């Protein structure tokens, strides 16, 4: 018995054992063996919501008030190619990881019966069997695998260090932004991590406001213009001024492309996703999906694909693409995708991947569902037409390339009616679309 051996060798050494968040360990008595219980808790990541963490640890303390516990693992994954203004559970956006950790750290620290915690993990690391947004990499780190700090690293530093000033404009993970705008400027959120009492932020020489720092961060809506935007954050630490400077580089995409004129146009959409996705080889930004509105662009019909309940997209690795996260989401049951735009010659590119192929459940995914009985499981067949012109007949991505594999289809078309509309008609199962890009040739 390991516990008996430990106490015989060193009666003063405390013992611990780690479990995932399931009551089975209490029911069979395993959690009574060691001095300290270690719980690997990921509520708000693999499953449930943040408040489920509070309920779990508080109930543990209520039932076992004399048993100290540690949070032996907590964390959320992130991919710098994925950014979101509306982050959600398990989307691998940098913003959801920040929200997760901003909730967990104070929740842990304000409970004295939690005697320790380990954020999983300090640095992104190799993990051979992991799939998800960055295959074979566990991306829950506070630093990237090349040891560059993520912005959220400075939240931990601000929270835990009182001996030095911490002031960080949290834009390093998203310095190059493509924003959708109705005019020449657009407001975007900017966060500052700090252990100061107050911080003032300015942009391009214009002071915005002074914000109180709560939970080691504050946020601003910052007006950004095309090109370089210089941000300056300043505050007082022990009577001395502290300052940090950072830049954001912005490209604008007009919301109403029909009214924007007949200039150069390249517009890519991350269909079925709430995230901006930036191809780190081409620097092309695929914009979050949106419903169609006259004069603009967007989907008509359908719904977001969820491989497991409560999660957007799938965690399965998609082959035949370097842009795995772009293909891990889709819109299913889609009727059409429409762009209102100037007449001219365009290239249309559609991206597809059948995400219902069976994949082995991996042990680290504590909230996964092994299979999902969707109508389009490896068998969807549908027709695709553009502006009434038949294009793909009885098309099945699964039949052409197999499940969880990317296939791209391109077409050149002359637009003469002020809109480019891609229509989808189901033959068997459900229609779906993972990504769409249009490019004006002339």
PLM feature spans:
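Aromatic sugar-binding surface patches on proteins
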Residues: 214-219, 403-407
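Compositionally biased, intrinsically disordered or flexible polar/acidic segments
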Residues: 250-442
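Surface-exposed loop/edge segments in extracytoplasmic proteins
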Residues: 202-211, 241-243, 389-394
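Short aromatic-centered micro-motifs
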Residues: 201, 235, 384, 388
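Short, exposed coil/turn segments at beta-strand boundaries within extracellular/luminal domains
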Residues: 237-245, 430
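Short, aromatic- and glycine-rich surface loops/edge beta-strands on solvent-exposed regions
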Residues: 228-237, 420-425
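Extended substrate-binding grooves/exosites of carbohydrate-active enzymes
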Residues: 1-208, 212, 221-224, 237
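Surface-exposed, short loops/turns at beta-strand junctions within beta-sandwich domains
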Residues: 222-228, 414-416
